[in-house]
């Protein structure tokens, strides 16, 4: 393999939505950085069966505003 072409693989801290913390190895950030999850297997609708709107930064509102005029017309 070629030398010095691979990213640095180091230990980081993961904090899940319920506050659980664990260490893993990743190329994310710098050694010792913390990755705080917005959604994880304990809170994801695909695994919990619950529907919820995840509007990060107003993306849903932005979409609705942009496409408000498009849709089926009422008769």
UniProtKB/Swiss-Prot annotation:
PROSITE patterns: RIBOSOMAL_L31. Pfam families: Ribosomal_L31. Part of the 50S ribosomal subunit. GO terms for cellular component: ribonucleoprotein complex; ribosome. The keyword Nucleus does not apply. This is Large ribosomal subunit protein bL31. Binds the 23S rRNA. It comes from Acidiphilium cryptum (strain JF-5). Belongs to the bacterial ribosomal protein bL31 family. Type A subfamily. InterPro entries: Ribosomal_bL28/bL31-like_sf (IPR034704), Ribosomal_bL31 (IPR002150), Ribosomal_bL31_A (IPR027491), Ribosomal_bL31_sf (IPR042105). Keywords: Ribonucleoprotein, Ribosomal protein, RNA-binding, rRNA-binding. NCBIfam families: L31 (TIGR00105), PRK00528.1 (NF001809). One of its GO terms (biological process) is translation. GO terms for molecular function: rRNA binding; structural constituent of ribosome.
């Amino acid at each position: 393999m070629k030398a010095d072409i691979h990213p640095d693989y180091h230990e980081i801290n993961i904090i899940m939505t319920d506050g659980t913390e664990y260490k893993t190895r990743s190329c994310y950030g710098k050694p010792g950085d913390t990755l705080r999850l917005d959604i994880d297997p304990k809170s994801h609708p695909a695994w919990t069966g619950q529907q919820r709107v995840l509007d990060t930064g107003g993306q849903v509102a932005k979409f609705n505003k942009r496409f408000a005029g498009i849709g089926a017309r009422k008769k």
